[in-house]
Every structure is written in C-alpha cells, then in structure tokens.
UniProtKB/Swiss-Prot annotation:
InterPro entries: AdoMet_synthase_2_family (IPR027790), AdoMet_synthase_3 (IPR042544), S-AdoMet_synthetase_arc (IPR002795). Its cofactor is Mg(2+). It comes from Methanococcus maripaludis (strain C6 / ATCC BAA-1332). Keywords: ATP-binding, Magnesium, Nucleotide-binding, One-carbon metabolism, Transferase. It holds the Pfam family AdoMet_Synthase. This is S-adenosylmethionine synthase. ATP binds at G141, Q142, G143, S144, V145, D146.
Length: 405
C-alpha cells in the first residue's frame, strides 16, 4: 500500500466563497499554441519510437517558443508582412546502438517534430497559411545521459521518477470553472466556426464570480477577411455573445451572468482584427507552461503546480504524469457519495518507482451527514487503484487522448 494520507479540507466550499477568479487561454493564444505543439510533437515521437523501436524512448519536447510576427489586418482582408517564428527545442533520443547488428540506428526526430508541429497548426489555426505565415525551426538535441539512464533503468519494471517533484489536482469543477472552460470550447468549436467564421482561435476567457454573479470578460480575435465593415465586426461580437449566454445556461445553477467581449474596442478605430485569427501575428509571443494547467484552467483560488505538462515524456516525467494522475484521482474521488470537494497532491522521489510516491495527499470536504472516517477508505482505494494501473495513464497520453492544457 502506498503512503496515502486522507484529511479534511479546512476551507469553505469554493462555490460558497465570496470571490472566485478563473481563466482559460484558448487554442489560438500564443502560449496555448506552444503547449499544443509541444504535446503534439511528444505524441508524434512516441508513435515514431514505437513503430521503429517497439518502445517509447526518452524525450522531453516541452521547450517551444513563439516569436510574434507582423501583420496589417484590415476590414475585407489584410496581409502578413513578417512570419511568426516557432522554435522547437528540448531533448530526444536521436540514435540507438543495435549491439547485435553492430550499427547505429538513426531516428528521424527533427522531421517527425516539424511535421507534427505543422499538422497541429493546420488544425488549430484555420486561417493561417503554413507556407507564408509561419516558420518552424527545430533545434531538438540529444537527451542528457544521466536522465536517460534513469529512464531506461530496468525497462521491464515500473518506470522510475525522473525528478523529485509533485502534481496537483482538484474536483469537481466549480460553476465558474465549468462556464469558463465550456465558453472557450464553444467559441473554438467547429460548429460555431461554421456559423460565425469571423471568430478567430485566439480567445481568452476570464471569469469573475462575486457572490452569485459571474462576469465573463472575453478577448476574441476576429478574422479580417470575414469582416467587411465595423458594423460587421459589432455584429460578430453580438452573435458570439448570444451563443455564450445561451450555452452558459446549462451550467449557471442559479447564478447571474454578464458577458463582455473585447472591452478595449471603440468599434471604430480600435478593434481586435487579425489576418490569421491569433495575436501571434502582431508581436505577441508565447511559451510552453505560461498558460492553462493540466485541467485546462488557471485557478488562482485553488492549489496549482507551476510546472508545464505539455511535451514532457509520458513514461517517467513526474511533471506530466503526476499532474494528470492527480486530476484523474480527484475526479474519481469526487464521485464517491458524500464527497463535496477533493484536492490531490502527489510527491515523487527521484529514482523511485512512480507507483510508490513519497506521499499521496487527499483532502476532502464531506457533504452534510457524512463523516471523513467513512469516506477515507473509499478515497484510499481509488488512489491505490490508479497507482497500481498507472500504465493506463501513460497509454492515454501516448495515444493523444489526454488534454494537457
């Protein structure tokens, strides 16, 4: 049995606190672009390694930098004059010694990485011309020998932690968290883009709850070729606002809602107009790990890990595995009858099996009529089950079926 500690969460339930702030950076935000590329590169490398070597080899591709380009957006359609520059860096296994054949097998790391980045951009930023609007530069290097040794040690056994680090998760999402998350998903959905094509992918949703009132302040890029006048632009905002308000009704749970879109506009001289749908075209830079946490949100009123999840290897990198695992365990513990809220923290120790954390800390707020003592064994059982089946988490990540930002 792992070192699992269960205790009462000594705080007011989040939905009953007077103030809550929640943020989500959308798919086209420069930081999210970097997160998405980093994870796509990692997933692509996992696939390539398995095809060529039968196993996932050591890599960390969590160092992606975006340098903003320069554009002249205008109603009816503008142009890019300086491309966005994206740097792929990090470490990966580029060659393997085949002792039986007596030769070195070279692996197509850089080609795989660049193709994955460009494929991701094609899906994520619909109006970006990949031939003219962006430059993707790959500078991924060979992995550190000592960390590769920790990664490769006793391959047939449980992977060993690459670092002494921790992961954090919580569940269930609060009303504000749900609305912020679902609002960005709506605005970047295929269905909404088909209906309102002028809505770009660079969207940031900031949610503020004061008592029973939730205010959403949304920054939403518009794509200039679909906007023929300032009146068109205003109409796009009105249509998007109506969609957000209608969608939010499913999650409001008695809360009042106010939606504000592009509050810096004057609707004549200053509007959020872009050529590509992202502010990355206008000098807005981006980096991995500066945006959403592993649950897709930035939640200053909850415990958070500052570590980036996207791009890290899914085999033994604690910054990835334990952050994702913490959220999975929290979600399952929160489903136990009598649990109102749950917070999880998991701490590793470098070189130790990832199934044996130094501590797995569970904090819960019981529902009225339930005692911590009766809930504790059930919560421990959930946590132990996931530690025993941690390879399932890795498989989900390798398959690209886990959201990391």
């Amino acid at each position: 049995m792992a070192n699992i500690v269960v205790k009462r969460l000594e705080r007011t339930p989040i939905d009953e606190t007077p103030v809550e702030i929640v943020e989500r950076k959308g798919m086209g935000h420069p930081d999210s672009i970097c997160d998405g590329i980093a994870e796509s590169v990692s997933v692509a490398l996992c696939k390539m390694y398995k095809e060529k070597m039968g196993v996932v080899l050591h890599h960390n591709t969590d160092q992606v930098e975006l340098v903003g380009g320069y554009a002249y957006p205008e109603v009816g359609g503008g142009c890019m004059v300086s491309p966005i520059y994206i740097l792929l860096s990090g470490r990966a296994t580029m060659e393997v010694l085949d002792k039986e054949a007596g030769k070195v097998i070279k692996l197509p790391v850089n080609t795989t990485a660049v193709n994955a980045a460009r494929d991701y951009l094609k899906k994520a930023i619909r109006n970006m011309d990949l031939e003219k609007d962006v430059v993707v530069d790959c500078r991924i290097g060979q992995g550190s020998v000592d960390l590769v040794e920790v990664f490769d040690r006793k391959r047939s056994e449980i992977p060993h932690a690459n670092d002494t680090s921790f992961g954090v998760g919580h569940a269930p999402l609060s009303t504000t968290e749900k609305i912020v998350l679902e609002t960005e998903k709506l605005l970047n959905s295929d269905a909404l883009k088909a209906e309102i094509p002028a809505v770009g992918e660079d969207i940031k949703v900031m949610g503020l709850r004061e008592g029973k009132k939730i205010t959403l302040t949304i920054a939403m890029a518009a794509v200039d070729k679909y906007v023929n006048s300032c009146a068109d632009y205003v109409k796009v905002k009105e249509l998007a606002k109506a969609k957000v308000e209608e969608n939010a009704k499913k999650y409001l749970d008695g809360h009042e809602l106010e939606v504000c879109i592009n509050t810096a506009d004057d609707d004549e001289d200053c509007i959020f107009l872009t050529v590509t749908g992202t502010s990355a075209e206008m000098g807005d830079d981006g980096s991995v790990g500066r945006g959403n946490r592993a649950n897709g949100l930035i939640t200053p009123f909850r415990p958070m890990s500052m570590e980036a999840t996207s791009g890290k290897n899914p085999i033994n990198h604690i910054g990835k595995i334990y952050n994702i695992l913490s959220n999975i365990i929290a979600e399952d513990v929160a489903k136990i009858e009598g649990v109102r809220e749950c917070q999880i923290r998991i701490l590793s120790q470098i070189g130790k099996p990832i199934t044996e954390p130094k501590i797995l800390d569970i904090e819960m707020i019981p529902e009225n009529g339930f005692e911590l003592e009766e809930l504790s064994p059930k919560a421990k059982e959930v946590a132990q089950k996931w530690l025993d089946n941690i390879s399932e988490v890795t498989e989900r990540i390798v398959s690209g079926n886990v959201t990391t930002f």
